[in-house]
């Protein structure tokens, strides 16, 4: 949807009934977020619209989307660690509200878990043991409700990859979760990045190279904004670092052009 149309929906939602306004706010937010890489301020616009909607009609769908937008705010709009923590904590709070209204909504549990995970990352795992327990519970709930939730599979894989063994970490299980996610959605570059990170930690250099190159070469990423802003630049940088350290072969030199005519 063009940005102008999304803005019209935002304006019309102001005068609509609460239920209609919530639906229109959700539609407008989706339109804004589909191409936020073109203007990251669209994240802020979507958040403002959803905040207004949940004030009058806090539906599970709008609360869940707002929880996701708070995550995007923390990852891509916050300028300081304090702002990041605030964003993720707001995402947690909103996620809890969504779960309370719709306990069987797997996406509500997902974004509660993801925002909680980001908060734990900032605090440090050993200082956030209670949060880790919440993340694991919510992650398990996501997959119980929907075993094919792709982002839920990536989340489960990330937990298995990053937690120490004494807290449930398991590299083999992590690989299985990531591969299952990519079987369902091969163009989910965030999941492929997590798999590449796992391979690097295991010193499986050719496997890591394959996944990173696949990210760079992607032509139809599921999450285009994330691929544009984070995954592709990061994959390129990681490939360069692996080559510089001699972990993978140097990139082939470009083929010479045609000889000039005499």
Question: How would you label these PLM feature ranges?
Answer:
Residues 40-45, 79-93, 126-138, 167-180, ...:
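Structural signature of tandem alpha-helical TPR/SEL1-like repeats
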Residues 62-63, 108, 152, 191, ...:
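TPR alpha-solenoid repeat register
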Residues 201-203, 209-262:
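Terminal, low-structured helical/coil segments at or just beyond the last alpha-helical repeat
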